[in-house]
Amino acid sequence: MFRQEQPLAEGSFAPMGSLQPDAGNSSWNGTEAPGGGTRATPYSLQVTLTLVCLAGLLMLFTVFGNVLVIIAVFTSRALKAPQNLFLVSLASADILVATLVIPFSLANEVMGYWYFGKVWCEIYLALDVLFCTSSIVHLCAISLDRYWSITQAIEYNLKRTPRRIKAIIVTVWVISAVISFPPLISIEKKGAGGGQQPAEPSCKINDQKWYVISSSIGSFFAPCLIMILVYVRIYQIAKRRTRVPPSRRGPDACSAPPGGADRRPNGLGPERGAGPTGAEAEPLPTQLNGAPGEPAPAGPRDGDALDLEESSSSEHAERPPGPRRPDRGPRAKGKTRASQVKPGDSLPRRGPGAAGPGASGSGHGEERGGGAKASRWRGRQNREKRFTFVLAVVIGVFVVCWFPFFFTYTLIAVGCPVPSQLFNFFFWFGYCNSSLNPVIYTIFNHDFRRAFKKILCRGDRKRIV
């Protein structure tokens, strides 16, 4: 992505998509003469084989991981939530990076020149910027989706339909295209000038200062800033709400807003509980039923909600139809969470008069509620730590993979010399983000782990049978 063969010379531009002769590239030990001859590759045979193997593993891991994500979303009932369509689109972009961009970048790297012609050079550069930018903007969209689901819990989750999510995904691709394609149609193609004799064709991204700065801001710095601010805000909200001790909650905390009996509208019921990264499923259900700034409904269920949240919707979705538990009868209105409650756990209390006969009428409920509050308090502290870790991974990996490249890319544009080997390393390191996205956004989520196990172990079960 944004490939630059060498540091820029003042006033020398290689427009995007042009085939630029580059006689002075010091990375080539020899070149082919116009009449024929042999080309010396920029790397030794051992280094070339190592680079090919590493890039091949990167491509295989990227394709394999992202294909697993797509299959899991479309085959697991626990992952049918509309917001998981973001992951499908993100995985598709990463697969396209691994199949349509990385192979040609690898060939260009190990051969030392562009072999595939001018037309494919323009297409390759446009696709490179498009797919990589799309991957980054997808992460930004996921963070905004999570933020809105917290700050506008019921209202936003009622609007979070597959059609709306698809519209947002289309917007993400349009934004990426706006950043990627204008140089192909708006920049006049120019030669090297100065009467240099062609030596080797090279395929280089537009290095004009205005494009480098604007594309870097649009492709990385702006989405990165949005992600950081959004995640900081999410953490602040979660921290404020999870640190309200149960003993300080007022009697009003036990009541839920109208329509709170069924938790599906706020996106946290059995079919919508699975957030893209697992972070959304961590602290949010404890506060989303109240108005902004209010603590979550306090009741016996909260003591166990911390444990139940790990299973989210998967426990409900994977349980085959069978006899109902004996305590389900009088509590049909709590079907969303009741299906996830383990034997011995109490069911959600929707209001003073909504509890079933097993939840009130004796001192057992109050006695259990007191112990549950203490357990809930300890669980919330642990949950806050886990949530902090997930956010640190999401933001940290994103910045670590992309910041070095975009920083040096901008430095080159403004005239600061950067060693070509260092720039090439950062260039390839940015591609690693496409392979790490499945790890970050799925391995931390219990529902995806279950779906992956089902997909990967399906063949073993068939052989055993």
Curated annotation (Swiss-Prot):
Residues 313-330 have a biased composition (Basic and acidic residues). GO terms for cellular component: axon terminus; cytoplasm; dopaminergic synapse; GABA-ergic synapse; glutamatergic synapse; neuronal cell body; postsynaptic density membrane; presynaptic active zone membrane. The modification Omega-N-methylarginine is found at R368. Residues 75-85, 145-164, 233-389, 446-465 are cytoplasmic. The modification Phosphoserine is found at S346. The record marks S215, S219 as: Implicated in catechol agonist binding. Residues 1-48, 112-121, 189-207, 415-424 are extracellular. The keyword Disulfide bond applies. The record marks D128 as: Implicated in ligand binding. Residues 242-378 are annotated as: Disordered. It comes from the Eukaryota. GO terms for biological process: adenylate cyclase-activating adrenergic receptor signaling pathway; adenylate cyclase-inhibiting adrenergic receptor signaling pathway; cellular response to hormone stimulus; DNA replication; fear response; female pregnancy; G protein-coupled receptor signaling pathway; glucose homeostasis. PROSITE patterns: G_PROTEIN_RECEP_F1_1, G_PROTEIN_RECEP_F1_2. The keyword Lipoprotein applies. One of its GO terms (molecular function) is protein kinase binding. Disulfide bonds join C121-C203. A lipid is attached at C457 (S-palmitoyl cysteine). Alpha-2 adrenergic receptors mediate the catecholamine-induced inhibition of adenylate cyclase through the action of G proteins. This is Alpha-2A adrenergic receptor.
